[in-house]
Amino acid sequence: MEERININVSATEYDKTSKELGKVLGNMEETVDGQDDFVITDSEFAFGWHFFVASVNREMVTKLADMMGEQFNNYKGKGLDKKFVSLLSERMEGKDLKIKFALKEEMESSKFGIF
C-alpha cells in the first residue's frame, strides 16, 4: 500500500480553496508524471472555517523533491513532509484565500494536548 502524507487544511471558502489546491497539486502531479497521487476530502464546517484533508502520495512528493533538488531543501521545515507543506503554502499564496495547513500527524500528537 502506498504511503501518504495527510495534511489538515483549514479554509474560509471550501469550494474556491479546494479547487485552487487541486490545481496546485495537479500541476505538481503532472511535473512528476504522476496519476491519482492526491485526494481532497469533503469539508466539515465549524466556527466559520471549513476543515478538510489533502492526502498526497509520498512517492509523488519524493519525486518532486528529487527534481527540485536544493531548491526543495531550502524550504522551511525538518524533513520531507514539513518542507512539502512549506512548498504548498508558498504555491497557494497570492490566491486571495484564507488557508492554513498542518500535518495531520502533528495535530494528533500529544504535543498539542487537545486532540
Q: Across the structure, where does each feature detected by a protein language model lie?
A:
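Conserved short beta-strand edge segments in small beta-sheet-based binding/regulatory domains
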Residues: Q71-F112
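Short beta-strand-to-loop capping motifs
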Residues: I7-K16, V53-M60
